[in-house]
């Protein structure tokens, strides 16, 4: 199971901004952490998002909707979601 760290996602975001333009930087670290941890929530003994597809989708949605970055939130959401693609 791939679990991206906050540092890895910040680095990926910086690379995306360098390649595609925009403003670099984290706007809210707590929202970033929330988006990164959401796919791995559980209730009792069950994962809320049990499949890799559901985890990837929840990660992409969280990064897109939380607006943790100054710019490029949709780009980083799509990019991190696609990192799971070879595993699906």
Predicted feature descriptions by range:
Residues 1-88:
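FIC/Doc superfamily catalytic core
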């Amino acid at each position: 199971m791939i679990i991206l760290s906050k540092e890895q996602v910040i680095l990926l975001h910086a690379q995306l901004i360098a390649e595609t333009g925009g403003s670099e930087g984290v706007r809210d670290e707590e929202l970033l952490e929330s988006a990164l941890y959401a796919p791995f929530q559980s209730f009792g003994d069950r994962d809320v998002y049990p499949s890799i597809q559901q985890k990837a989708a929840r990660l992409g949605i969280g990064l897109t909707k939380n607006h943790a970055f100054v710019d490029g939130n949709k780009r980083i959401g799509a990019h991190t979601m696609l990192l799971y693609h070879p595993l699906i």
